[in-house]
């Protein structure tokens, strides 16, 4: 009788010593402590932001100053509810406070998960966190400095001669904040490409072959974000986004998961 080969056994990597030696209660207590510190940092950031709420509102209103209708008083920002100013101040303080506290909150998250990682994972973890933070900040600055000054005046001046405009302050600021957050997330594209590559979901070959679809999607997104008919403004958004896609392809190749047979392949003789 032919004997069947023994079934393959999955060899699990042992847990890091720091993680294996700590009981569950200690992990929960550590999580509780990190959450409390994160909430404290957020509260401090909100208090600081609320103190400068007037300056923050003026900062968000800067893109309006590029519109002649606003500077000449033909378009005004108004509030339509009694508590709108108070609610708006708290809402703006939350987002600004979260922005101020985010580095400290991310550090608390990293300090909690780092003991459960292997040394090679810890080596790349902190640079990725810093890179993600820098990319998000770059996206926010890019949207605020280059895109909003074009988009906001165009939307305000569209059909300006046929309607009388009184823009709701809360809706305007909500739109600006949402737009800036979206641009910050869009600039995380290279980081996302690396994460998906390390998880084995995509690889650099797939990303390279899909560049046409990515370009079409980016052009459509740029047309939506910048509704002006000027191709230069559309290119202002599309070119950086596609450059980020190409950067993601390069990083996907650099941080690709190397197959075992490729690791064991001997180097060619010189």
From Swiss-Prot:
Main location: membrane
Superkingdom of origin: Bacteria
Record keywords, A-Z: Cell membrane, Membrane, Protein transport, Translocation, Transmembrane, Transmembrane helix, Transport
Pfam families xrefs: TatC
Keyword Cell membrane: yes
Localization per record: Cell membrane
Keyword Manganese: no
One GO CC term on file: TAT protein transport complex
GO molecular function: proton motive force dependent protein transmembrane transporter activity
Biological process, per Gene Ontology: intracellular protein transmembrane transport; protein transport by the Tat complex
Transmembrane intervals: 35-55, 93-113, 124-144, 176-196, 209-229, 231-251
Record membrane topology: Multi-pass membrane protein
Family: Belongs to the TatC family.
Protein purpose: Part of the twin-arginine translocation (Tat) system that transports large folded proteins containing a characteristic twin-arginine motif in their signal peptide across membranes.
HAMAP family: TatC (MF_00902)
Subunit structure: Forms a complex with TatA.
Family matches, as PANTHER family: SEC-INDEPENDENT PROTEIN TRANSLOCASE PROTEIN TATC, SEC-INDEPENDENT PROTEIN TRANSLOCASE PROTEIN TATC, CHLOROPLASTIC-RELATED
NCBIfam families membership: tatC
Protein's name in the database: Sec-independent protein translocase protein TatC
Gene name for this UniProt entry: tatC
